[in-house]
């Protein structure tokens, strides 16, 4: 899980979602997981 000021999808399978008001990227590839904060 990477914590970044701006989250962007890296590949086609990356999905940008909102959980508890935080923007996150979830993906099949665990290296692509990102959280805004």
Swiss-Prot record:
- List where the protein spans the membrane: none
Pfam families for the chain: Ribosomal_L36
Q: Which GO terms describe its molecular function?
A: structural constituent of ribosome
Q: Give the CC-aspect GO terms.
A: cytoplasm; ribonucleoprotein complex; ribosome
Record keyword Secreted present = no
* Keywords of the record: Ribonucleoprotein, Ribosomal protein
- InterPro entries from the entry? Ribosomal_bL36, Ribosomal_bL36_sp
Family to which the UniProt record says this protein belongs: Belongs to the bacterial ribosomal protein bL36 family.
Indicate what this protein is called per its UniProt record. Answer: Large ribosomal subunit protein bL36
Q: Which organism is it from?
A: Moorella thermoacetica (strain ATCC 39073 / JCM 9320)
